[in-house]
């Protein structure tokens, strides 16, 4: 739960207002899918004991659509050529309200929920006795678990444009919802719109940023409103006025998108959805917003200073970090042991504890990988291509850093070291967010690494994010963060991809396969299969599925593999063909799409290499897959047709690793089908730019310029 939304745990009575742009489609017809999703969410809240009040718009738009259609079917061709008179809104409201409420009644009844309609006008609220009776009626309906559905009775309203009148009662359904929230003593008001929330500019402008928490003193003068919605009366301006009115009266308000199918549930769960208006927001939001943005900006500034130093100086920084890791081994291991003990006490899964643990060999290996990285060819400013555009006009394509990276990872503190060293080698700024289970390990490693960075670059080159609540704010900073790399569970990767406009690089699963062909050397096959599964079962490149040619089930080869795996303590789950062979006594698997991350794997029999390829391409995660075969034609078929980031022949899947591939280290393994695929080292953290060197040439309509477009040899790099 986001810290700014912690108050929702005490919410019981909720007013939900849904706007015309959400209730209707672009053609004016009612949006059945969105309304169905809305009703399902309200049903869920009702079943969980919440008291839900719905304020709805859409009657005028729905009625206008019906009347236009009726007029169209009853018009002659000559009538259609005449200027069309806009239909009266009050008549539209009278026609549309009936159909709108009938739809709500149908949808709620399908969910075993009852709705009640209440129509009000602004004049009604001038009468204190009306307010009292309205409150009593709504309370009675809530006690009966009925959903009150309120709307302004536009058909008989005496108010005319401009709708915001001096009486200050209400002038649209946003202000009506705010008024009702106060009258009915609601704990929360949710205003559903056709955009994700309040932006500091028009939502269509890519430079506009979503404001997660509105602070009047900060944002009032910064916001530029765009056009109002296509059908509604007030647009975002009206929503903000209504939200400020309710919030400062003590009722929290959240403006969120009504087009998402689960935003109401997310709001109630305390997720950072939409824009929050809260009377106490000015006390706690500014420090947090400033902190994460300043951290990202500082990382960018430090990265530019890092790029400005010489290649030898960057190399020395890495060597100093490697030395510092070894010099501080005892401190690092002491903090790591505390994390491991806490994780075991908390009952964390064994695979997570295994990834969390460090030892002297791991620290030595990390230091070694950093030194290998330091000795690699300078990656920044490499000339990748030279072209003579015209006489005296030379174009160069050069490598350069991406900018600022945000890495979100779980449980593995050694990942922090690898990522930090790669960021420094590639000239990038870095923000790191590790899992809470490795909090102490990450803190000491971050301190050791940043202490080795010279002042001329600045230790803010690498920032450590310590609060989970800051992640949603970081994911909104697409103007200062250039790439997000999540390393962890499928759930983590998926959540991040859904929550940001920043490019995301990574893999969600590591469902790696080993296929043993009938031509395989079985002694080799046993070694590779055991290594792929047992060397480090929690690794993302560990074998999760063993596929075996059908002939090996008949000649004893499969039995030997199963015996060896059992001897090493591996639990096996069989596919349908294994399950049919009772002699192996293997429990049937429920799915082939499972990453165990533990001493367990799936085993299945396939007819041939083509069946193995089809299985891998269908059930795999495009990570790492291996064939064991002596038949080179079969092996080449496998290597060419398996669509994975790394494909191996007669070698363990555990070799798919940045250090083992000679990359020095890896920031992660990407299964995305982009430039960076497989283990991502320094090159995956670089982009390119064009440098054009001329001698006074101008385009001038391409007159006087003779284009040659001649490839030129690359020149030696400057250090």
UniProtKB/Swiss-Prot annotation:
It comes from the Eukaryota. In the N-terminal section; belongs to the glutamate 5-kinase family. Gene3D superfamilies: Acetylglutamate kinase-like, Aldehyde Dehydrogenase, Chain A, domain 1, Aldehyde Dehydrogenase, Chain A, domain 2. It catalyses: L-glutamate + ATP = L-glutamyl 5-phosphate + ADP; L-glutamate 5-semialdehyde + phosphate + NADP(+) = L-glutamyl 5-phosphate + NADPH + H(+). Residues 1-293 are annotated as: Glutamate 5-kinase. ATP binds at residues 193-194, 233-239. InterPro entries: AceGlu_kinase-like_sf (IPR036393), Ald_DH/histidinol_DH (IPR016161), Ald_DH_C (IPR016163), Ald_DH_N (IPR016162), Aldehyde_DH_dom (IPR015590), Asp/Glu/Uridylate_kinase (IPR001048), G-glutamylP_reductase_CS (IPR020593), Glu/AcGlu_kinase (IPR001057). P5CS plays a key role in proline biosynthesis, leading to osmoregulation in plants. Pfam families: AA_kinase, Aldedh. GO terms for molecular function: ATP binding; glutamate 5-kinase activity; glutamate-5-semialdehyde dehydrogenase activity. Expressed at high levels in leaves and is inducible in roots subjected to salt stress. Feedback regulated by proline. Pathway: Amino-acid biosynthesis; L-proline biosynthesis; L-glutamate 5-semialdehyde from L-glutamate: step 1/2; Amino-acid biosynthesis; L-proline biosynthesis; L-glutamate 5-semialdehyde from L-glutamate: step 2/2. The keyword Disulfide bond does not apply. Residues 294-719 are annotated as: Gamma-glutamyl phosphate reductase. Substrate binds at residues 57, 154, 173. This is Delta-1-pyrroline-5-carboxylate synthase. GO terms for biological process: L-proline biosynthetic process. Its EC number is 2.7.2.11, 1.2.1.41.
């Amino acid at each position: 739960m986001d810290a700014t939304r912690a108050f929702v745990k005490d919410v019981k009575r909720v007013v939900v207002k849904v706007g015309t742009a959400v209730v209707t489609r672009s053609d004016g017809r009612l949006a059945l899918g969105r309304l169905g999703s809305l009703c399902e969410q309200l049903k869920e809240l009702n079943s969980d004991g919440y008291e839900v009040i719905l304020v709805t718009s859409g009657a005028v738009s729905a009625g206008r659509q019906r009347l236009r259609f009726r007029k169209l079917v009853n018009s002659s061709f000559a009538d259609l050529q005449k200027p069309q008179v806009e239909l009266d809104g009050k008549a539209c409201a009278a026609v549309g309200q009936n159909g709108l409420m009938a739809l709500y009644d149908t949808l709620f009844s399908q969910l075993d929920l009852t709705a009640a309609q209440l129509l009000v006008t602004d004049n009604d609220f001038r009468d204190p006795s009306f307010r009292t009776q309205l409150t009593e009626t709504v309370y009675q309906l809530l006690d009966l678990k009925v959903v009150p559905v309120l709307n302004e009775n536009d058909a008989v309203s005496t108010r005319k444009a401009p709708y915001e009148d001096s009486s200050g009662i209400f002038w649209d359904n946003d202000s009506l919802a705010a008024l009702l929230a106060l009258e009915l003593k609601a704990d929360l008001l949710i205003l559903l719109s056709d955009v994700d929330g309040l932006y500091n500019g028009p939502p269509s402008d890519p430079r506009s940023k979503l404001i997660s928490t509105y602070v009047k003193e900060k944002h009032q003068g910064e916001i530029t409103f765009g056009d109002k919605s296509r059908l509604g009366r007030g647009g975002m301006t009206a929503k903000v006025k209504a939200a400020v009115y309710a919030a400062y009266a003590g009722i929290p308000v959240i403006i969120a998108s009504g087009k998402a199918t689960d935003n109401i549930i997310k709001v109630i769960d305390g997720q950072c959805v939409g824009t929050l208006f809260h009377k106490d927001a000015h006390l706690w939001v500014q420090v947090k917003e400033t902190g994460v943005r300043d951290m990202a900006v500082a990382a960018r500034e430090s990265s530019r200073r890092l790029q400005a130093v010489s290649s030898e100086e960057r190399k020395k920084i890495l060597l100093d970090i490697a030395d510092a890791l070894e010099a501080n081994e005892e401190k690092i291991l002491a903090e790591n042991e505390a994390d491991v003990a806490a994780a075991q006490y908390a009952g964390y899964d064994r695979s997570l504890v295994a990834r969390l643990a460090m030892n002297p060999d791991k620290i030595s290996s990390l230091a070694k990988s950093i030194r290998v990285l330091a000795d690699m060819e300078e990656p920044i400013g490499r000339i990748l291509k030279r072209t003579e555009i015209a006489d005296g006009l030379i174009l160069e394509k050069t490598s350069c850093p991406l900018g600022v990276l945000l890495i979100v990872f779980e449980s593995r503190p050694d990942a922090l070291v690898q990522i930090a060293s790669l960021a420094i080698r590639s000239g990038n700024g870095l923000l790191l967010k590790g899992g809470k289970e490795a909090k102490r390990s990450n803190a000491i490693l971050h301190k050791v690494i940043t202490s080795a960075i010279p002042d001329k670059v600045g230790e803010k080159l690498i920032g450590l994010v310590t609060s989970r609540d800051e992640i949603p704010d970081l994911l909104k900073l697409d103007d200062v963060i250039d790439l997000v790399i999540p390393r962890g569970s499928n759930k983590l990767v998926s959540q991040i991809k859904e929550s940001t406009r920043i490019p995301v690089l990574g893999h969600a699963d590591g469902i790696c396969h080993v296929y043993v062909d009938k031509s395989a050397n079985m002694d080799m096959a046993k070694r590779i299969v055991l290594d792929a599964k047992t060397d480090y079962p929690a690794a993302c490149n560990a074998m999760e599925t063993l596929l075996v040619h059908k002939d090996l089930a008949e000649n004893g080869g499969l039995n030997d593999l199963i015996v060896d795996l059992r001897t090493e303590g591996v639990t096996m789950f069989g596919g349908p063909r294994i399950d049919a062979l009772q002699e192996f006594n293997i429990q049937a698997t429920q799915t082939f799409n499972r990453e165990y991350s533990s001493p367990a794997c799936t085993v299945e029999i396939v007819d041939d290499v083509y069946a193995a390829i089809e299985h891998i391409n269908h059930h795999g995660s495009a990570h790492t897959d291996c064939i064991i075969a002596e038949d080179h034609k079969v092996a080449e078929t496998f290597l060419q047709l398996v669509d994975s980031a790394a494909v191996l022949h007669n070698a363990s899947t555990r070799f798919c690793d940045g250090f083992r591939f000679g990359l020095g280290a890896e920031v992660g393994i990407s299964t995305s089908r982009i430039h960076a695929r497989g283990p991502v080292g320094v090159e995956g953290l670089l982009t390119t730019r064009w440098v054009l060197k001329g001698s006074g040439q101008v385009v001038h309509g391409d007159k006087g310029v003779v284009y040659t477009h001649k490839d030129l040899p690359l020149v030696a790099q400057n250090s």
